[in-house]
UniProtKB/Swiss-Prot annotation:
SMART domains: PINT (SM00088). Gene3D superfamilies: 1.25.40.570. The keyword Amino-acid biosynthesis does not apply. Residues 265-427 form the PCI domain. InterPro entries: CSN1_C, PCI_dom, Rpn7/CSN1, Rpn7_N, WH_DNA-bd_sf. It comes from the Eukaryota. This is COP9 signalosome complex subunit 1. The gene is csn1. It is found in: Cytoplasm; Nucleus. Essential component of the COP9 signalosome complex (CSN), a complex involved in various cellular and developmental processes. The CSN complex is an essential regulator of the ubiquitin (Ubl) conjugation pathway by mediating the deneddylation of the cullin subunits of E3 ligase complexes, leading to modify the Ubl ligase activity.
Length: 487
């Protein structure tokens, strides 16, 4: 039978006045889709070596689609690697893109990178041979699985489904791979088998970007006795599994734009057991976890969970720029922090999972910096503040206005003198108001309790009207109520 190969490509107002929202503000949280990275500082060979399988191919294709400078090199690397798989359709697609990219380079001689070469010819013999090999292997695995089912040996059937899933994955048919891995669930005879099945389903679901499926199977794996019942010290194998689950959950939370939850997941990963090249590298954990924490954690959380974390420190050693950004932010050196963020932005935009969130994360980090900068002061000179944040006074005023309207800064702006004043809060009046409100609530509850006690003491009860079709008898609930009042 022919092998069906389906190719999936991974991708309350403070001010009493009303202000019309700038349409650009509504788009601020929209993911960047069409952008071009012109000045990357990425070592492509080292970057690609951090991943394996379909993830390496997809990440290289993502870079090729968004960075003209690295397009030819990325496609050549992807073409070379895809020939180690049965993924014929992706091979042909990458070769077509490489031919187009090479023609573009030849038409713009000034942009030709050093060492540029003509793309290799389409290897039709490899294509035909690989299709035949894939078909033969599929038929063999299918026959083996039928024999296992005939013998009714659960362990063999489970392995047969896993082998079929591995083959479909190698061919790029993610839909059938997911079906095979999922079918293995009925033949799992131990917690270890269930965890292995969950990890396989999670891996394919990440490739398909089916994030709800990812979280569902992470939860299933974490609820197995082998993971759930262990407390305190875990053995190396269990810790490795838990790290994979936390990394996958972190990716799903990141995709759902739940950045604080994503940060917490990545921070729970163990550096010594982080070996998941099919999805992400330890460097990714450092970048994803660091930026999400920076955008959502307050100073205490940042110090306790990131800076003082002995495990996450090891991840940050792999990404010294991210580490320095976090320390600069914590030390309130915001100009240096924001400048360093701009320096790494191009590389972040080449990450297929982080790229859609770069603009939002950067905005949240900048807003948090503005809030922290102003929090100790009664008033702040906006000229000095603009210098500290490397921006103009008018742009800063717009940012502060938005923060005030969102209730993130309790302040008012003297637009003439360019001074930001903290709003005076009368703590005495506020405390009195809270006390009075609490007193009114206690009074209401006390009256309700007195009324209930009086009703019970006088044996007052209300008989519910008979329902349609009934003979007017008391319901069990009413009977019980009547008994309790007569006792």
């Amino acid at each position: 039978m022919p092998l069906p190969v389906q190719v999936f490509n991974l991708q309350s107002a403070v001010e009493p006045m009303q202000i019309d929202a700038d349409p650009q503000d509504d788009q601020q949280n929209m993911p960047d889709v069409n952008y071009v990275v012109e000045n990357p500082t990425l070592d492509l060979e080292q970057y690609a070596s951090s991943y394996s399988g379909l993830m390496r191919i997809e990440r290289l294709q993502f870079i090729a689609d968004r960075c003209p400078q690295l397009r030819v090199e990325a496609l050549k690397m992807a073409l070379s690697f895809v020939q180690r798989t049965f993924n014929v359709d992706v091979y042909e697609d990458i070769h077509r893109k490489l031919a187009e990219a090479s023609r573009e380079v030849q038409n713009a001689p000034d942009a030709v990178p050093e060492g540029s070469m003509e793309p290799p010819a389409l290897d039709t013999s490899w294509v035909e041979a690989t299709r035949k090999k894939a078909l033969l292997k599929l038929e063999k695995l299918d026959t083996d699985l039928k024999n296992y089912k005939g013998n009714s040996i659960k362990e063999s059937i489970r392995r047969g489904h896993d082998d079929l899933g591995d083959h479909y994955l190698d061919c790029g048919d993610l839909s059938n791979a997911l079906k095979c891995y999922s079918r293995a669930r009925d033949y799992c005879t131990s917690a270890k088998h269930v965890i292995n099945m969950c990890l396989n389903v999670i891996k394919v679901s990440v490739y398909l970007q089916n994030w709800s499926h990812v979280l569902s199977y992470v939860s299933k794996a974490e609820s197995t006795p082998e993971i759930a019942e262990q407390r305190g010290e875990r053995d190396s194998q269990t810790q490795a599994v838990l790290t994979k689950l936390k990394c996958a959950a972190g990716l799903a939370e990141l995709a759902a734009r739940k950045y604080k939850q994503a940060a917490k997941c990545f921070l729970l990963a163990s550096f010594d057991h982080c070996d998941f090249p099919e999805l992400l590298s330890p460097s990714n954990v450092a970048v994803y976890g660091g930026l999400c924490a920076l955008a959502t954690f307050d100073r205490q959380e940042l110090q306790r969970n990131v800076i003082s974390s002995s495990s996450f420190k090891l991840f940050l050693e792999l990404e010294p720029q991210v580490r320095d950004i976090i320390f600069k932010f914590y030390e309130s050196k915001y100009a240096s922090c924001l400048k360093m963020l701009d320096e790494i932005k191009d590389n972040l935009l080449l990450d297929m999972y982080l790229a859609p969130h770069v603009r939002t994360l950067y905005t949240q980090i900048r807003n948090r910096a503005l809030i922290q900068y102003f929090s100790p002061y009664v008033s702040a000179d906006m000229y000095k503040m603009a210098t500290a944040f490397n921006t103009t006074v008018s742009a800063l005023e717009d940012e502060l206005t938005q923060l005030i309207l969102e209730g993130l800064i309790n302040a008012r702006i003297d637009s003439h003198s360019k001074i930001l004043y903290a709003r005076d809060v009368d703590q005495r009046s506020t405390t009195f108001e809270k006390s009075l409100q609490m007193g009114r609530e206690f009074q209401r509850r006390a009256k309700a309790m007195i009324l209930r006690a009086a009703v019970l003491r006088n044996q007052i009860h209300v008989k519910s009207p008979p329902r349609e079709g009934s003979q007017g008898e008391l319901t069990p609930a009413n009977s019980q109520s009547r008994l309790s009042t007569n006792m």
